[in-house]
Amino acid sequence: MKAGWNAAVGLTIARVVFEPPRAAPRWMQTPHNPLLDTLQPYPFERLRALTKDLQPNPALRPISLGIGEPKHPAPKLIEDALMAHLSGLSVYPATAGEPRLREAICGWLQRRYGLALDPATQVLPVNGSREALFAFAQTVIDASRPGATVVCPNPFYQIYEGAALLAGAKPAFANSDPARNFAADWRQIDDATWARTQLIYVCSPGNPTGAVMPLEEWRQLFELSDRHGFVIASDECYSEIYFRDEAPLSGLQAAVQLGRPDFRNLVAFTSLSKRSNVPGLRSGFVAGDAALLKKFLLYRTYHGSAMNPMVQAASVAAWNDEAHVVANREAYRAKFAAVTPLLAEVLDVALPDASFYLWAGVPGGDDIRFTLELLAQYNVAVLPGSLLAREAQGVNPGRGRIRLALVAEEAECLEAARRIVDFTRAYRA
């Protein structure tokens, strides 16, 4: 099945090189923050450049496993809460959020992790974890200190790197370790780099790997933080999609278990997008060290990032209900149970600890070529792993793997899996 694949597209596989444009005369230049010029193209932008001349097989309906956007229906209780609070349009919201929302968040943290946090000082509502993860770096990074560094897992959620660069810091990367379920190997960061580090982003469960960080690694990070004074930002937005009986450990939970009930130099970010299938709601929270959150609230007060009252009301309803979360998790479990064994026949793939991604190795190790030919011949879109990582310690840890987001309904995910199996059986690496 070769429809849409031609030599011209084949040449594209050689890799798209993104070169900065030649500098225009100053009078023609648009005034801007020069740090914007340090940003890398987003993975989907790079993939669009790779596929711009490609014609997917028109005989097959397109299926996308590329974007991690939940496709399960939004819970009715959230929709009802939004509609019931439209009067909130007529008031300015407080940046710190309404007390009832902070209390609902603390109630969820108590039920989920057994944590007792102060709703007045240890939690802040945010407009989804993405904006908060970015904005937090702008709050805690002191770019005037020589060599300001932000440590990130590799591969990684691209916001971490962008946040570091626009805060005036340099990102440093800890590659994933295939021998440890693709968890980030923090031991790859040397002492000199740790000494310059001001912030580390932890992603647990990981994107794209699904790996959950165990308690012992939290202990090691806390010891490093105490020694060097850096802040830990734990991105936990996939925490409610897991496949075994034991729920993923939170950084906050780990801190309490290790005798750090004040969450010193630690904050955790959680979102309703994946937990409750409401990515358009843009709602989440950050919790942890009260002193850090006081500074973050000051930043957010000027940044104009208050959550609107209707979204706050809907968020209260979401955090107070667990039935829809259990049903959502069961739907993902059913999909992964059906799809993973199929793909394991032809790809290097296994059930992750958590998240809604499969992190699959491809025959021959060329993730770009595999992605393009799969799209051209079978009209299935996936994301090349090399676009989610950076070259570090001489390797790109995403190369040779693809990320598959099993976000659509089970039947569509199964159809995509069958096409991938058929394609891979005929694929010549």
Name what the model sees in each region.
Residues 27-131, 135, 318-319, 427-429:
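N-terminal small-domain helix-loop-helix segment of the aminotransferase-like
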Residues 54, 58, 167, 227-228, ...:
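Helix C-cap/helix->beta junction micro-motif
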Residues 89-223, 240-241, 246-260, 413:
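Conserved core of the PLP fold type I
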Residues 148, 227-230, 263-264:
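A short helix->loop->beta-strand "cap" motif at the edges of active sites that frequently abuts
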Residues 253-333, 337-342, 424:
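Conserved core segment of the aminotransferase class I/II
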Residues 261, 373-382, 389-429:
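PLP-dependent enzyme catalytic core of the Aspartate aminotransferase-like
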Residues 312, 316, 332-340, 349-362, ...:
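Conserved glycine-rich beta-strand-loop-beta hairpin in the small C-terminal domain of fold type I
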